[in-house]
Amino acid sequence: DGLDRLGKALQRFIKEDPTFRVSTDDETGETVIAGMGELHLDIYVERIRREFKVDVTVGAPKVSYREAPTRLASYDYKHKKQTGGSGQYAHIVGSLEPMPEDVEENFIFEDKVVGGRVPREYIPSVEKGFRFSMEKGPIAGFPIVGVKTVLSDGSYHDVDSSDMAFQICARSCFRETFLQTKPVLLEPIMKVEVEVPADFQGPVTGELNKRRGLIVSTETENEV
Protein backbone atom coordinates (compact mmCIF):
# COMPACT_ATOMS: atom_id res chain seq x y z
CA ASP A 1 0.00 0.00 0.00
CA GLY A 2 1.34 3.42 -1.02
CA LEU A 3 0.43 5.15 2.23
CA ASP A 4 2.23 2.50 4.28
CA ARG A 5 5.36 2.81 2.14
CA LEU A 6 5.22 6.60 2.40
CA GLY A 7 4.93 6.37 6.18
CA LYS A 8 7.93 4.05 6.38
CA ALA A 9 9.95 6.38 4.16
CA LEU A 10 9.19 9.44 6.27
CA GLN A 11 9.97 7.62 9.51
CA ARG A 12 13.33 6.50 8.14
CA PHE A 13 14.20 10.03 6.99
CA ILE A 14 13.32 11.45 10.41
CA LYS A 15 15.68 8.96 12.07
CA GLU A 16 18.47 9.65 9.56
CA ASP A 17 18.23 13.45 9.55
CA PRO A 18 17.24 15.60 12.58
CA THR A 19 16.66 18.61 10.28
CA PHE A 20 13.94 16.74 8.36
CA ARG A 21 10.47 17.30 9.85
CA VAL A 22 7.01 15.98 9.02
CA SER A 23 3.58 17.30 9.95
CA THR A 24 -0.01 17.13 8.70
CA ASP A 25 -2.08 20.11 7.61
CA ASP A 26 -5.25 19.85 9.71
CA GLU A 27 -7.36 21.69 7.13
CA THR A 28 -6.29 19.90 3.93
CA GLY A 29 -5.00 16.58 5.29
CA GLU A 30 -1.81 17.04 3.28
CA THR A 31 1.51 15.72 4.55
CA VAL A 32 3.97 18.59 4.95
CA ILE A 33 7.73 18.00 4.91
CA ALA A 34 10.23 20.64 6.03
CA GLY A 35 14.00 20.83 5.80
CA MET A 36 17.02 23.02 5.14
CA GLY A 37 16.01 24.15 1.67
CA GLU A 38 14.46 23.26 -1.68
CA LEU A 39 17.36 21.03 -2.83
CA HIS A 40 17.33 19.21 0.52
CA LEU A 41 13.64 18.37 0.10
CA ASP A 42 14.00 17.47 -3.60
CA ILE A 43 16.48 14.74 -2.63
CA TYR A 44 14.01 13.19 -0.18
CA VAL A 45 11.12 13.37 -2.67
CA GLU A 46 13.27 11.57 -5.24
CA ARG A 47 14.17 8.91 -2.65
CA ILE A 48 10.48 8.38 -1.88
CA ARG A 49 9.83 7.75 -5.57
CA ARG A 50 12.94 5.69 -6.31
CA GLU A 51 13.56 3.67 -3.13
CA PHE A 52 10.02 3.26 -1.84
CA LYS A 53 8.17 3.24 -5.19
CA VAL A 54 5.60 5.82 -4.09
CA ASP A 55 4.29 8.14 -6.80
CA VAL A 56 3.78 11.27 -4.69
CA THR A 57 2.33 14.56 -5.91
CA VAL A 58 4.38 17.49 -4.65
CA GLY A 59 3.20 21.07 -4.30
CA ALA A 60 5.31 24.20 -4.71
CA PRO A 61 7.77 24.74 -1.84
CA LYS A 62 6.94 27.45 0.69
CA VAL A 63 9.28 29.52 2.82
CA SER A 64 8.89 28.77 6.53
CA TYR A 65 8.42 32.22 8.01
CA ARG A 66 8.08 33.05 11.70
CA GLU A 67 6.02 35.71 13.50
CA ALA A 68 7.52 37.84 16.27
CA PRO A 69 6.51 40.79 18.48
CA THR A 70 8.36 44.11 18.27
CA ARG A 71 7.06 45.98 21.33
CA LEU A 72 5.51 45.41 24.75
CA ALA A 73 1.75 45.17 25.14
CA SER A 74 -0.19 44.82 28.39
CA TYR A 75 -3.26 42.66 28.80
CA ASP A 76 -6.22 42.54 31.19
CA TYR A 77 -8.38 39.74 29.84
CA LYS A 78 -11.48 38.13 31.29
CA HIS A 79 -13.07 34.90 30.02
CA LYS A 80 -16.63 34.52 31.25
CA LYS A 81 -19.19 32.04 29.96
CA GLN A 82 -22.45 31.09 31.61
CA THR A 83 -24.63 28.20 30.45
CA GLY A 84 -27.37 26.18 32.11
CA GLY A 85 -25.00 24.41 34.49
CA SER A 86 -21.69 25.57 35.87
CA GLY A 87 -20.04 28.33 33.87
CA GLN A 88 -16.49 29.29 32.99
CA TYR A 89 -14.56 32.13 34.56
CA ALA A 90 -10.92 33.18 34.30
CA HIS A 91 -9.22 36.57 34.53
CA ILE A 92 -5.54 37.28 33.83
CA VAL A 93 -3.46 40.46 33.87
CA GLY A 94 0.10 40.90 32.64
CA SER A 95 2.23 41.71 29.62
CA LEU A 96 3.68 40.26 26.44
CA GLU A 97 6.94 41.55 24.97
CA PRO A 98 9.82 40.70 22.62
CA MET A 99 12.49 38.42 24.02
CA PRO A 100 15.71 40.21 25.07
CA GLU A 101 18.33 39.93 22.31
CA ASP A 102 20.79 38.05 24.52
CA VAL A 103 18.26 35.26 25.21
CA GLU A 104 18.14 32.37 22.74
CA GLU A 105 14.89 30.80 23.97
CA ASN A 106 11.71 31.25 21.92
CA PHE A 107 9.33 31.51 24.88
CA ILE A 108 9.59 32.55 28.52
CA PHE A 109 6.70 32.57 31.00
CA GLU A 110 7.12 34.55 34.24
CA ASP A 111 4.73 34.07 37.15
CA LYS A 112 4.60 37.24 39.27
CA VAL A 113 1.23 36.63 40.90
CA VAL A 114 1.15 37.31 44.65
CA GLY A 115 -1.48 36.80 47.31
CA GLY A 116 -3.30 33.98 45.53
CA ARG A 117 -5.08 36.28 43.10
CA VAL A 118 -4.73 33.43 40.61
CA PRO A 119 -4.59 30.08 42.46
CA ARG A 120 -1.34 28.15 42.01
CA GLU A 121 -3.12 25.19 40.40
CA TYR A 122 -4.32 27.36 37.50
CA ILE A 123 -1.00 29.01 36.63
CA PRO A 124 0.31 26.04 34.57
CA SER A 125 -2.91 26.23 32.54
CA VAL A 126 -2.18 29.86 31.68
CA GLU A 127 1.32 28.94 30.52
CA LYS A 128 -0.06 26.00 28.53
CA GLY A 129 -2.58 28.26 26.80
CA PHE A 130 0.15 30.75 25.89
CA ARG A 131 2.44 28.00 24.57
CA PHE A 132 -0.36 26.52 22.47
CA SER A 133 -0.96 29.93 20.89
CA MET A 134 2.69 30.12 19.80
CA GLU A 135 2.16 27.27 17.33
CA LYS A 136 0.15 29.35 14.85
CA GLY A 137 0.41 33.13 14.69
CA PRO A 138 -2.47 35.46 13.77
CA ILE A 139 -0.65 37.27 10.92
CA ALA A 140 -0.20 34.41 8.48
CA GLY A 141 -0.46 31.21 10.51
CA PHE A 142 3.29 30.72 11.02
CA PRO A 143 4.85 29.72 14.37
CA ILE A 144 5.58 32.57 16.79
CA VAL A 145 9.08 33.07 18.20
CA GLY A 146 10.83 35.38 20.65
CA VAL A 147 8.09 36.01 23.21
CA LYS A 148 8.34 36.80 26.92
CA THR A 149 5.04 36.68 28.82
CA VAL A 150 4.44 37.89 32.36
CA LEU A 151 1.42 36.97 34.49
CA SER A 152 1.12 39.53 37.29
CA ASP A 153 -2.50 39.48 38.47
CA GLY A 154 -5.99 38.20 37.84
CA SER A 155 -9.02 36.76 39.59
CA TYR A 156 -11.05 33.57 39.81
CA HIS A 157 -14.45 32.21 40.78
CA ASP A 158 -14.87 29.52 43.44
CA VAL A 159 -17.27 27.48 41.29
CA ASP A 160 -16.79 28.49 37.65
CA SER A 161 -12.98 28.64 37.44
CA SER A 162 -11.10 25.58 36.15
CA ASP A 163 -7.92 24.56 34.37
CA MET A 164 -9.77 24.61 31.05
CA ALA A 165 -11.26 28.06 31.70
CA PHE A 166 -7.82 29.54 32.36
CA GLN A 167 -6.33 27.78 29.35
CA ILE A 168 -9.07 29.12 27.05
CA CYS A 169 -8.62 32.56 28.60
CA ALA A 170 -4.86 32.47 27.94
CA ARG A 171 -5.30 31.40 24.31
CA SER A 172 -7.77 34.17 23.50
CA CYS A 173 -5.76 36.71 25.47
CA PHE A 174 -2.50 35.82 23.71
CA ARG A 175 -3.97 36.19 20.24
CA GLU A 176 -5.54 39.56 21.02
CA THR A 177 -2.47 40.91 22.83
CA PHE A 178 0.05 39.65 20.26
CA LEU A 179 -1.65 41.77 17.59
CA GLN A 180 -0.97 44.83 19.76
CA THR A 181 2.80 44.16 19.80
CA LYS A 182 3.20 45.30 16.16
CA PRO A 183 4.21 41.78 15.09
CA VAL A 184 6.41 41.21 12.05
CA LEU A 185 7.19 38.30 9.75
CA LEU A 186 10.72 36.89 9.95
CA GLU A 187 12.26 34.95 7.08
CA PRO A 188 14.99 32.33 7.49
CA ILE A 189 18.59 33.29 6.78
CA MET A 190 21.67 31.16 6.39
CA LYS A 191 25.30 32.09 7.02
CA VAL A 192 27.53 30.87 4.20
CA GLU A 193 31.15 31.23 3.13
CA VAL A 194 31.77 31.37 -0.64
CA GLU A 195 35.16 30.75 -2.27
CA VAL A 196 35.55 31.73 -5.95
CA PRO A 197 38.42 32.74 -8.24
CA ALA A 198 39.12 36.48 -8.01
CA ASP A 199 37.96 36.98 -11.62
CA PHE A 200 34.45 35.85 -10.64
CA GLN A 201 34.11 38.02 -7.53
CA GLY A 202 32.06 40.69 -9.31
CA PRO A 203 29.46 38.37 -10.88
CA VAL A 204 29.11 36.31 -7.69
CA THR A 205 28.70 39.46 -5.57
CA GLY A 206 26.06 40.70 -7.98
CA GLU A 207 24.19 37.41 -7.80
CA LEU A 208 24.20 37.47 -3.99
CA ASN A 209 22.96 41.07 -3.93
CA LYS A 210 20.21 40.19 -6.39
CA ARG A 211 19.03 37.54 -3.96
CA ARG A 212 19.10 40.04 -1.06
CA GLY A 213 22.25 38.52 0.40
CA LEU A 214 24.18 40.60 2.93
CA ILE A 215 27.94 40.45 2.37
CA VAL A 216 29.72 40.84 5.71
CA SER A 217 33.32 40.78 4.46
CA THR A 218 35.54 39.79 1.53
CA GLU A 219 39.12 38.55 1.48
CA THR A 220 41.54 37.78 -1.36
CA GLU A 221 44.12 35.05 -0.87
CA ASN A 222 46.13 33.31 -3.61
CA GLU A 223 43.87 34.81 -6.27
CA VAL A 224 40.81 33.29 -4.57
Residues covered by each model-derived region:
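Accessory interaction regions appended to the cores of large information-processing enzymes
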Residues: 1-224
